[in-house]
Amino acid sequence: MATTRYLARYGVPCDSAFSLLEEVALDVADGRIAWVGEESAAPVHEGPTVKLNGLVMPGLINAHAHSPMTLLRGAGDGLPLMEWLTQVMWPREGQMNPEDALWGMRLGAAEMLLAGVTASCEMYLFEESLVQASLEAGIRLAITPGIISALHGETYNASKSRLSAIADFHSQYHNPES
């Protein structure tokens, strides 16, 4: 696969010096960044070149997300937290199914990618649906299966069972592309 060079006016390499580079070249080979720096220092390039507007920087990370809830956006706006949770969100979430979570995650992933977010840490139900949607979208995913039931009188043995299920989930999905 050919290396594609992207040229931009500015770039933020996120190095230890907190640099802001001008006239930046970014080389991508096989879907991975192969080189980034000032264009004047770039290696010889004979492949396709794309001129970009704006700033080149690493993708952002959403460190706390419940993306399938995009389907519930606007429900109960303006209510106090506990009223919103108990009267609006939890009843609606109780009616959701894996396909709802799949479509909600697809929508959430599309919105994040359009905003420059390339990784998300998700905490939600129907974990397999979230994995599927994330793989389809090409967004990186860290997922923590829900354990909220532990806060609602769940027995110790049931909590241990859920933790075991979480460990099994991790074994199944950790680095699914490798």
PLM regions: where:
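N-terminal metal-binding scaffold of metallo-dependent hydrolase/deaminase domains
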Residues: 1-44
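Active-site gating loops and adjacent loop-to-helix segments of metal-dependent hydrolytic enzymes
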Residues: 71-103, 110, 142-163
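A cross-domain feature marking catalytic cores of carbohydrate-active enzymes
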Residues: 65, 123, 143-147
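Short acidic/polar active-site loop segments enriched in Thr and Asp
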Residues: 118-119
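Short beta->alpha connector loops
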Residues: 11, 123-127
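Short loop/helix-cap segments at secondary-structure boundaries that form the rim of catalytic
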Residues: 39-46, 132-136
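Metal-coordinating catalytic core of metallo-dependent amide/deamination hydrolases
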Residues: 129-178
